[in-house]
Amino acid sequence: MIELKSIFQTYKGPTGPVEALRGVDLQINPGEVYGIIGRSGAGKSSLVRVINLLNRPTAGQVLVDGRELTSLNGDALRVARRDIGIIFQHFNLLSSRTVYGNVALPLEIAGLSAGEIKARVEPLLDLVGLSALADRYPAQISGGQKQRVGIARALANRPKVLLSDEATSALDPETTRSILGLLQQINKEFGLTIVLITHQMQVIKQVADRVAVIDAGRIVESGPVIDVFTRPQHDTTRSLIAEIVPQDLPESVLARIRTLMSAGHPEEGQLLRLAFAGDESDRPLLSDVIRRFGIDLSIVHGQVDEIQGKPFGSLAVFARGAREQLNAAVAHLRGAGVHVDQVDGALPGGLAGGFSHVQ
């Protein structure tokens, strides 16, 4: 549905050229919800504005539904843009128009008759739950309702793609969940491809199928959301998901582990982080490892959550036993689909708050 090929975007800055995008390659499938996440200044908004050519890239190709937008100009580009709706953080509603009038605006510009406009606008207002507010003005409705107007307006031309540029960043958590639920409903009912630009991992966790992490204008990691959350490969990704899947252990937990490791036990101790998702969480893997390899396991920290109804989580486990048995247990867990990280350093003095990434 959407393909970006070697996209570069350079702007003029006060001290010289600024490279906002540096060789971005991206492929988004029809009907999926695709998240693009990064810190402020990473290039997220530049990327979303390239998709509909609000900003024409300095180099590279943009293809949407098989058409190369970068080869279009004038009327041909304006017609192609009707297949791409967009919603913004600050709503961008016309204060002089009612809710109905704001949704009708793109249809008026497209030249539809009053009857055709009514036939489209009324179902859209019903879809977003604003039929009773059709005659109100933006100043008379809440922020969440304004964003619902923005969504209805973005859908007015029956687009194939919906771009969401930080659309929930100005909303409270409850309203954010409501708007994301509406986007999920639209995606499922109409098969609409949705691209979510955000700095909030909670947004990605709730609705996205796949995600790309952007940093300094480059895509540094991408994949299914559940894989990226449970097996982050890049430092930027680990930092972004820390609010949902903590990457460091609390000091109180580290203190208990130091006590365990310095207890003078004759068998070796090892701290492991186990990351699991989906069906892996339903199997009695820890009890199986204890029975099979004769080692002791103590859960010292853990968290379990869900991504779109699928369980995922991580456990910090202190394992004690003979080195050969510990290695065999780790190999067994990895073979069962559990991602296992081992802490750097076997002695208390080498114990740190983070996990290494030994595969």
UniProtKB/Swiss-Prot annotation:
Species for this entry: Polaromonas sp. (strain JS666 / ATCC BAA-500)
Gene3D superfamilies: 3.30.70.260, P-loop containing nucleotide triphosphate hydrolases (3.40.50.300)
Pfam family, one: ABC_tran
Catalytic activity of the protein: L-methionine(out) + ATP + H2O = L-methionine(in) + ADP + phosphate + H(+); D-methionine(out) + ATP + H2O = D-methionine(in) + ADP + phosphate + H(+)
Record membrane topology: Peripheral membrane protein
GO cellular component, one term: plasma membrane
Domain ABC transporter: 2-241
UniProt-recorded name of the protein: Methionine import ATP-binding protein MetN
Residues given in the record as ATP binding sites: 38-45
